[in-house]
Amino acid sequence: RLVTEAKKRGIRIILDAVLNHTGADSKYFNKFGNYPGVGAYQSEKSPYHNWYYFEEFPDKYRCWWGVTVSPTLNKSDPSLRRMMLHKGGVIRKWTDMGIAGWRLDVVDELEEDYVRSLRRVIKQRDKDKLIIGEVWEDASNKISYGKRRHYLLGGELDGVMNYVFK
């Protein structure tokens, strides 16, 4: 209903997708036990355990920039990819609801094949959906984890945040 009402008023909605990490208090990680289900932090048998990188279960896990309340997602895990990209998944569901596009948080932390998969799913639904990436450095010449990125060469993003061009 929000998307429909916004369109009537000439407003388009772009969602901010954080696909690199979750909060430690998300239902998937559930570090503080605030949700009824068993999160990845609580049990190695959790359906979400492989969504994260545990080095020493449960207290030593990869985090975005070492921030322990932001555990890093294992984007190559098949069940996480299904939840994000496949039928009934987050990206398809919201794209099909009529949003105008996506802003991808810390896109330089996402592997290129993952970003291409996101683009494919989004553009198959509607080629005019906008995909913007958050890149803190010069996105036209970015090297991330030792690899040159190709954000703006047609296979990944439509645009980037312009932090370096103040």
Regions found by a protein language model. Name each.
Residues R1, Y28, V67-M83, I99-E109:
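The substrate-binding groove and active-site-proximal loops of carbohydrate-active enzymes
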Residues R1-L15, R82-H86:
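Aromatic- and glycine-enriched glycan-recognition loops and surfaces
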Residues V3, H21, N30-G37, G89-R92, ...:
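Active-site-proximal helices and loops of the catalytic beta/alpha 8
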Residues K7, H21, S26:
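Histidine-centered active-site/metal-ligand motif
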Residues I13-A17, R103-L104:
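Short beta-strand segments at enzyme active-site cores
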Residues S26, S46, D77-P78, G89:
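Serine-centered coil/turn micro-motif
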Residues K27-L73, K166:
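Core domains of carbohydrate- and sulfate-ester-processing enzymes
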